[in-house]
Every structure is written in structure tokens, then in C-alpha cells.
Amino acid sequence: MAKKLSRRFKEALAKVDQDKAYEPLEALNLLKETATAKFDETAEVHVRLGIDPKYTDQQLRTTVTFPKGTGQTVRVAVIARGEKVQEASSAGADIVGSEELIDEIQNGMMDFEVLIATPDMMPKVAKLGRLLGPRGLMPSPKGGTVTTDLAAAIQEFKAGKQEFRADRTGIVHVMFGKASFTAEDLLVNLKALQETIDRNRPSGAKGRYWRTVFVSASMGPSIQVDVNSLRDLKVTEA
């Protein structure tokens, strides 16, 4: 059965030319214009890449640091032992523990957006893989969430660092700010993501790497961004 569209969504949809790939700044102004919910909507980007992640040399998993932040309060949990527990608490971690925290998570406690672990705890954390993996929360060295430098990692994730990966169809889904951000600040963040994706191009990627880029507010319609314009763009963070 076809989903009935709300009047608010139909009005927002009417502002978007579905056959057009917009210049990046124009697309982001349109994202703000079509964010008409009664709350501050999240700015989302969906990038289709020319990769097949079933092959290990075509997988993409890395982190991006958004210069303008994400506009979200990020709750960070840390699994460590000994003096590292106090180090994590002092650095601003919201939840810190050792084996008891692993047990709590195994029993369903998921009150965090980022989970960091020290390398010596990973053999014990490994049993959480089936629970955390599908949620994108499993600590990994590549994602910057397995580390001995807890203070730096906590501060970076609190400030807007975000881990992302291409899904099984080769699409990257990332939240890169809030609709209340200026279009210029959203553009700085979007450009940071584009450069990160280019920098981390999988070695096995063949042919055209970038296929399509769409942005939207979380409750708004999709807006296509001109890929070449985004990649050619030079932005300043000021």
C-alpha cells in the first residue's frame, strides 16, 4: 500500500526539481528551506559509490572530523581497566567501566553513541561483536575507537568526529549537522566528508567512484547534489 504523504512533505517536495543535480550551496539552502518540522532536523547525506563491499578491497570504513561539529550531544562510553578508567572519566567520558560495563552492554544497555576500548580489553569486548556490529558501535582501530590515547579520542568524538562505513550496497549514510546550521557551515562539513571519502578510496574500486550524492533534512525530501561541483569546490572554514 502506498504511503500517504503529509501536506507538509508535499509542499517541501514541490520545491525540489527531482531531475536536477544542484550546485552544493544551492542544495544546502534548499535543505534548510525544506526542513519544516517543529524540531531542529538533522542534515543527512547519502553517497552512492562505485564499490562492491562484499570484496574486502572494496570496503570503506573510516572516520571524518566535521569542522563545524554535528550539533548533537554525543555520549561516549569507554571500556578500560586500571588507571585508564580514571583517565577516561577525567577526559569527559559519560560511561566508564571494565568487565561490568561489558556485561551491562550484553544485557541491553545502549545509552551511548560512541564506544571506545583500550587494546588490552578487546579480547573481552570481542564477545559483543554480534550485538554491536550491526549497530556500527563495535570498537575498531580503523574507526579510531580502539586506542590507548583515551583523552584525545573522547575529545575528538565529542567535538564532531564520526565513524562511517559504506553499507552492503555501497552507499554511505552520514549525519553532517543540523538544519539550523548556516548553509555555509553545512557546506564546510559536506566538503570535509567528500575529501575523506576520496582520501580513503578502497584499493579495489574500479571505474567511476562517485555515482550520486543526495542531501536532505531528516523529515524532508531528497535533493541531488552535483558531484563534480562538490569535488571541485574550494571552501574555507572561516
From Swiss-Prot:
GO terms for cellular component: large ribosomal subunit. GO terms for biological process: regulation of translation; translation. Pfam families: Ribosomal_L1. InterPro entries: Ribosom_uL1_bac-type, Ribosomal_uL1, Ribosomal_uL1-like, Ribosomal_uL1/biogenesis, Ribosomal_uL1_3-a/b-sand, Ribosomal_uL1_CS. GO terms for molecular function: rRNA binding; structural constituent of ribosome; tRNA binding. Gene3D superfamilies: 3.30.190.20, 3.40.50.790. Keywords: Repressor, Ribonucleoprotein, Ribosomal protein, RNA-binding, rRNA-binding, Translation regulation, tRNA-binding. CDD domains: Ribosomal_L1. The keyword RNA-binding applies. Part of the 50S ribosomal subunit. Binds directly to 23S rRNA. The L1 stalk is quite mobile in the ribosome, and is involved in E site tRNA release. Protein L1 is also a translational repressor protein, it controls the translation of the L11 operon by binding to its mRNA. HAMAP family: Ribosomal_uL1_B. This is Large ribosomal subunit protein uL1. It comes from Gloeothece citriformis (strain PCC 7424) (Cyanothece sp. (strain PCC 7424)).
